Amino acid sequence: MEMEMAEGRLGRVIALRLKPGTDVLLGLTEACKRAGINNGVILSAIGSLDGVSYCNPVELPTKAGYGYGEVLHLTGPIELTSGAGIICHDDEGNTNLHVHMSLSDRYGNAH
């Protein structure tokens, strides 16, 4: 069975509340920089959003696996009902986030 695995240890735990109007990914990236976090996990995320832009996965005919489709936009109010992800960095030390979120719109539709 092919897989990649990495081991880590739980160190600091940081609780974060972003101010209203803050872009979630930009806010998380800035929080990581301020806290000196190069690698980590996002264990949970919830909240209310004015709107959201996101991408769904799509098959790519020229590449194994999946990629991302067109950017979709929802206007608020939007509930962030669940979020989790990883924090890593590239060779230049820039913070990279990979976050999955479940969203609910005003009509009860899940996104």
Protein language model features and the residues they cover:
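N-terminal intrinsically disordered, cationic/polar leader segments
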Residues: 1-111
